Amino acid sequence: MQIQIVCVGKIKDAYISSGVVEFEKRLRPYGKIFITELAEVKIPDNASASDELRVKEREGELILANVKEGFFKIALDPNGMSLSSEEFSDVFRDAKLSGKNLCFIIGGPLGLSPKLLQSVEKKLSLSRMTFTHPMTRLILLEQVYRAFRILNGEPYHK
């Protein structure tokens, strides 16, 4: 199974970068994990609502252009479904059984465009709380790792 994470913005904090590297290393035995990091579209100073929508639309176009062909798209969105870690592991089990590869999408600071959200197969919320987008990447990788441990009946802290 292949798992792509498409995200807008670079990680600037060393502690987040080291966490991401650690989980990428831990995930190697379970499948090919790759991260596609895209540059943020500049938000104009004193941006209007229509300016912000244009930024989200442009980022959405960039994201969709970088999703690997045929991958099952899951957008991280505050209004998406909330899953337990066990339920999240079912997403991977189902994908594996159906021969699908997964692509998780993390937007920029303004979020994801309505057009992109309409184009994905699933919307997932990691929490009702707000996280920075780099932190979201780290939390997602940890949950992906946890999901594989659950699927394989391997121990992991609860």
From Swiss-Prot:
GO cellular component terms listed in the entry, alphabetical order: cytoplasm
- State the similarity comment: Belongs to the RNA methyltransferase RlmH family.
SUPFAM superfamilies linked to this entry: alpha/beta knot
Question: Which keywords does this chain's UniProt record carry?
Answer: Cytoplasm, Methyltransferase, rRNA processing, S-adenosyl-L-methionine, Transferase
Q: Kindly report, in one word, the top-level EC class recorded for this enzyme.
A: transferase
Instruction: Enumerate the InterPro entries for this protein.
Output: Alpha/beta_knot_MTases, RlmH-like, tRNA_m1G_MTases_N
Q: What's the catalysed reaction?
A: pseudouridine(1915) in 23S rRNA + S-adenosyl-L-methionine = N(3)-methylpseudouridine(1915) in 23S rRNA + S-adenosyl-L-homocysteine + H(+)
Please describe what this protein does. Answer: Specifically methylates the pseudouridine at position 1915 (m3Psi1915) in 23S rRNA.
Query: What is the protein's name according to its record?
Result: Putative ribosomal RNA large subunit methyltransferase H
Provide the primary localization: cytoplasm
> What species is this protein from?
Methanocorpusculum labreanum (strain ATCC 43576 / DSM 4855 / Z)
Which positions are annotated as binding S-adenosyl-L-methionine? 76, 107, 126-131
